[in-house]
From Swiss-Prot:
<dbReference type="GO" id="GO:0006468">
    <property type="term" value="P:protein phosphorylation"/>
</dbReference>
<dbReference type="GO" id="GO:0005829">
    <property type="term" value="C:cytosol"/>
</dbReference>
<dbReference type="InterPro" id="IPR000719">
    <property type="entry name" value="Prot_kinase_dom"/>
</dbReference>
<feature type="region of interest" description="Disordered">
    <location>
        <begin position="1"/>
        <end position="23"/>
    </location>
</feature>
<keyword id="KW-0067">ATP-binding</keyword>
<dbReference type="InterPro" id="IPR011009">
    <property type="entry name" value="Kinase-like_dom_sf"/>
</dbReference>
<dbReference type="InterPro" id="IPR008266">
    <property type="entry name" value="Tyr_kinase_AS"/>
</dbReference>
<dbReference type="GO" id="GO:0004674">
    <property type="term" value="F:protein serine/threonine kinase activity"/>
</dbReference>
<dbReference type="InterPro" id="IPR022495">
    <property type="entry name" value="Bud32"/>
</dbReference>
<feature type="binding site">
    <location>
        <begin position="41"/>
        <end position="49"/>
    </location>
    <ligand>
        <name>ATP</name>
    </ligand>
</feature>
<dbReference type="GO" id="GO:0008033">
    <property type="term" value="P:tRNA processing"/>
</dbReference>
<keyword id="KW-0819">tRNA processing</keyword>
<dbReference type="GO" id="GO:0000408">
    <property type="term" value="C:EKC/KEOPS complex"/>
</dbReference>
<feature type="domain" description="Protein kinase">
    <location>
        <begin position="35"/>
        <end position="252"/>
    </location>
</feature>
<comment type="function">
    <text>Component of the EKC/KEOPS complex that is required for the formation of a threonylcarbamoyl group on adenosine at position 37 (t(6)A37) in tRNAs that read codons beginning with adenine. The complex is probably involved in the transfer of the threonylcarbamoyl moiety of threonylcarbamoyl-AMP (TC-AMP) to the N6 group of A37. Bud32 has ATPase activity in the context of the EKC/KEOPS complex and likely plays a supporting role to the catalytic subunit osgep.</text>
</comment>
<dbReference type="GO" id="GO:0070525">
    <property type="term" value="P:tRNA threonylcarbamoyladenosine metabolic process"/>
</dbReference>
<keyword id="KW-0378">Hydrolase</keyword>
Length: 252
């Protein structure tokens, strides 16, 4: 599903009906307020995320909200551009075999993306529970290896996630598959610097939320090298980014 195919005009929405959905069940994406039909599950700086129902199927709706300080026309253009970029990133990953939420509907007029509801826990929560458990070490190592492999493939497509943290990775309950979520800050770039910064964001997330996780991140990097053709250059640049980060921490 190309981004242009799933975008809509201000007064309509293009729908992809999930196979398991009931065709007799409908909702109006034009008039429905999500806080009336859905459950707010998170709110960030750019968007709110709801759990709701689409054609009888549980789904997640991500709704970008307007910024009062921006001119309405400019605000809509920026929101539309970011939504379409997120959709493109998800589609690229899906076509390459990366586990990401399936897209159901994109409603540009209302700044919404309807996507697959994934039942599972975040990698962050999994590590909180099991990092110190000896019986889970093999599983944790397997997850870290998969993380490195998948990020390498994502970067090989020149997709920059923009917010690589263990909160934005899920373990699907039914299969334990690793699923990447929240591509709201993603963009396309072949820059070694951008890829290195993407990895640095993940490293800082490990340092700040998962104590004694240095070896875990090293496992990620080792497996990143297996799927990224320019991994050596990216990791060299990562070392430079780390140095800049330390200087900023020391001197402000």
């Amino acid at each position: 599903m190309d981004a242009n195919e799933c975008s809509n005009s201000e007064n309509s929405a293009t729908t992809t009906i999930p196979k398991s959905a009931s065709p007799s069940t409908t909702i109006s994406t034009k008039v429905v307020k999500l806080d009336e039909i859905g459950i707010l599950i998170s709110q960030g700086a750019e968007a709110k995320t709801y759990e709701t129902d689409l054609y009888g199927l549980k789904c997640i709706v991500k709704e970008r909200f307007s910024k009062a300080y921006r001119h309405p026309i400019l605000d809509q253009k920026i929101s539309s551009k970011r939504i379409l970029q997120e959709v493109r990133s998800l589609n690229k990953c899906k076509k390459k075999g990366i586990q990401v939420p399936s897209l159901y509907l994109v409603d540009i007029g209302n700044n919404r993306i309807y996507m697959e509801f994934i039942k599972g826990e975040t990698v962050k929560h999994y590590l909180y529970k099991n990092q110190e458990s000896t019986q889970h070490q093999n599983q944790i190592e397997s997850i870290m290896k998969e993380l490195g492999n998948q990020i390498g493939i994502i970067h090989e497509m020149n997709v920059i996630h923009g917010d690589l943290t263990t909160s934005n990775m899920l373990l699907r309950e039914s299969t334990n598959e690793l699923v990447f979520i929240d591509f709201g800050l993603s963009y396309t770039s072949n820059s070694v610097e951008d890829k290195a910064v993407d990895l640095y964001v993940l490293e800082r997330a490990f340092i700040s939320t998962h104590p004694n996780s240095e070896q875990l991140f090293q496992t990620i990097l080792s497996n990143y090298e297996l799927t990224s053709s320019n991994s050596k250059i990216v990791i060299q640049k990562l070392n430079q980014v780390r140095l800049r980060g330390r200087k900023k921490t020391c001197f402000g």
